[in-house]
């Protein structure tokens, strides 16, 4: 089946939408490796795409117990809503965020990656 011009254009719009969204979006695999992230996920922390994507998400969390709990919950099939966390900025400061995330599982119920949305915690602004 060939992609039509409309299909290609729709895909371009969707990729632009995701990459330029005003909330942070990322996918993390079962080994905690960041597979993909949009600009709103890494730029507010002071990182470039190369400094962020491909690295372990644990490198960017200030509290090991928090990210370990997040990963454990997602790997077991739970979803998260407004989960508070502190992220590490490149300059050494931290940002308080709220995380909403769920896991993507394949037909054999194997974990594929997270579907994570990150916003700045409004109670800290």
Pin down the residues of each PLM region:
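PAS-family sensory/regulatory domains
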Residues: 39, 51-64
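Sensory modules in modular signal-transduction proteins
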Residues: 7-30
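PAS-family sensory domains and close relatives that share small-molecule sensor folds
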Residues: 89-91, 100-106, 117-120
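Terminal output helix/cap of sensory domains in signal transduction proteins
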Residues: 63-93
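PAS/LOV sensory domain surfaces, especially short acidic/polar patches at coil-to-helix junctions
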Residues: 31, 35, 39-43, 55
């Amino acid at each position: 089946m060939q992609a039509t011009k409309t299909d290609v254009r729709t895909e371009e719009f969707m990729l632009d939408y995701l990459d330029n969204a005003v909330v942070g979006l990322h996918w993390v695999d079962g080994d905690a490796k960041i597979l993909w992230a949009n600009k709103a996920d890494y730029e507010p922390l002071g990182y470039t795409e190369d400094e962020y994507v491909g690295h372990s998400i644990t490198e960017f969390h200030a509290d090991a117990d928090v990210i370990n709990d997040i990963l454990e919950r997602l790997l077991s099939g739970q979803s998260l809503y407004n989960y508070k966390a502190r992220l590490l900025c490149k300059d050494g400061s931290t940002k308080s965020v709220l995380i909403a995330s769920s896991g993507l599982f394949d037909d054999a119920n194997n974990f594929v990656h997270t579907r994570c949305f990150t916003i700045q915690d409004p109670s800290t602004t």
